[in-house]
Amino acid sequence: MNLEETMPLVFERSIPGRIGFSLPESDVPETKASDFFEEAYLRSTPADLPELSELEIMRHYTNLSNHNFGVDSGFYPLGSCTMKYNPKINEKVARFPGFANIHPNQPESSVQGALELLYDLQTSLVEITGMDEVTLQPAAGAHGEWTGLMLIRAFHEKNGDTKRTKVIIPDSAHGTNPASAAVAGFDVVTVKSNEKGLVDVADLKKVVGEDTAALMLTNPNTLGLFEKDIVEMAEIVHAAGGKLYYDGANLNAIMAKVRPGDMGFDVVHLNLHKTFTGPHGGGGPGSGPIGVKKELIPFLPTPVLTKKEDAYTFDYNYPDSIGRVKPYYGNFGINVRAYTYIRTMGPDGLKLVTEYAVLNANYMMRKLQAAYDLPFDQVCKHEFVLSGNRQKKLGVRTIDIAKRLLDHNFHPPTVYFPLIVGEAIMIEPTETESKETLDSFIDTMLKIAKEAEENPEIVQEAPHSTYVKRLDETRAARKPVLRYQKEV
């Protein structure tokens, strides 16, 4: 398709009377919908569904897919998102009939194999995180954050400590952290970062108090830097009666090397769709389990999967539970994929994942620091943050650099985050990329930096080769059009 052409919507391709699929004749008596539903629920006009042949539908969606980009398409260095390769064996296992064809309403006795998998996954995550118990119920990361904070809230309320209304969050935190805290009913207090990009412990001491419910931390943080004072921070928060919450978005940097529970964290959420290779992007599904220390176990969402003698069962006898946070028992298919990954890799393999993720990030950072500003020049973990301030002085902004990368078949890194870095470029290569891929991306970034100096217009006007050019992203966010409406 020519880049100048506009691809019609599937509704706009519709030709009245065209058939895509013919159903066999019914072998049961025909009944009328009016025999079962009141008139108010019956359509007065036919549904305006597109009418196309099977071939037309196939070509339409194949063409759309060719304009998409995913991890299987190319390098996807989206910082803090861990866009690693999703092994296809995960997909095969998730499609085993014993997993794909069961239903959560079946009797427990008929799904013991599935329950055993979930129980073993919980056990593995307990070991990886250093927690005492794990629930797989939350649907994704932010949902896990909210669930963990609700547990902390329930804990304080159970102890009559209702004055603890504030959650402390670093100024470098993921945006979901303050959002989750607010939805959970807490007030958000910001703790500053110091000149090294780490939490300012002196400032933490100032903001911690009798009203502190928790401190939320990502470690390593969103700058890719390990919070070396974490043990001291845990002691400060615990001495004040608060809890320490671990945002597991960056677990890929420390997995099988160090455990959040050993650092002093009381609650942790994980992103199985990131660290443990469940495919993500496009709205899900995800999986956001939370792990807790012993004194928070009574507040876990019910039901809690347990093992009694030789059988696996759901336990609803948790009187202090915050209640169910999702229908049924979590996103089972993603949990199967994560379990497959953990069993495939084993402890030594997971340790290598961390080592290669950190090695790749440091290699790229050192290769790029001559052409881009490096606000925090120190060894990073799984990701690092550059600044495009140097290019901005030449009239080229970070968004221009991101768009120019599209012309070279690279997905852009995360941009303009974390907020404490001007013109931020946040790069996370993950462990699954080859040195050749890393070098190709590095060469492209160096080329774009040179273009910013010698031919800024080509960067400012990018992308040049994509089907869709620059969108009005502000309007798309504020006035989204989410469904087709036929013009009359």
Curated annotation (Swiss-Prot):
Keywords linked to the UniProt accession: Oxidoreductase, Pyridoxal phosphate
GO cellular component assignments: cytosol; glycine cleavage complex
Cofactor(s) the protein needs: pyridoxal 5'-phosphate
One term of GO molecular function: pyridoxal phosphate binding
Pfam families tied to this protein: GcvP2_C, GDC-P
InterPro entries from the UniProt entry: GcvPB, GDC-P_C, GDC-P_N, GDC_P, PyrdxlP-dep_Trfase, PyrdxlP-dep_Trfase_major, PyrdxlP-dep_Trfase_small
GO biological process: glycine decarboxylation via glycine cleavage system
Catalysed reaction equations from the record: N(6)-[(R)-lipoyl]-L-lysyl-[glycine-cleavage complex H protein] + glycine + H(+) = N(6)-[(R)-S(8)-aminomethyldihydrolipoyl]-L-lysyl-[glycine-cleavage complex H protein] + CO2
Leader peptide range in chain numbering: none
Keyword NAD: no
EC numbers on record: 1.4.4.2
Group of enzyme by EC: oxidoreductase
Coiled-coil segments on the chain, per record: none
N6-(pyridoxal phosphate)lysine carried by residues: 274
Record's subunit section: The glycine cleavage system is composed of four proteins: P, T, L and H. In this organism, the P 'protein' is a heterodimer of two subunits.
Family per record: Belongs to the GcvP family. C-terminal subunit subfamily.
NCBIfam families assigned: PRK04366.1 (NF003346)
Described purpose of this protein according to its UniProt entry: The glycine cleavage system catalyzes the degradation of glycine. The P protein binds the alpha-amino group of glycine through its pyridoxal phosphate cofactor; CO(2) is released and the remaining methylamine moiety is then transferred to the lipoamide cofactor of the H protein.
Protein name per the record: Probable glycine dehydrogenase (decarboxylating) subunit 2
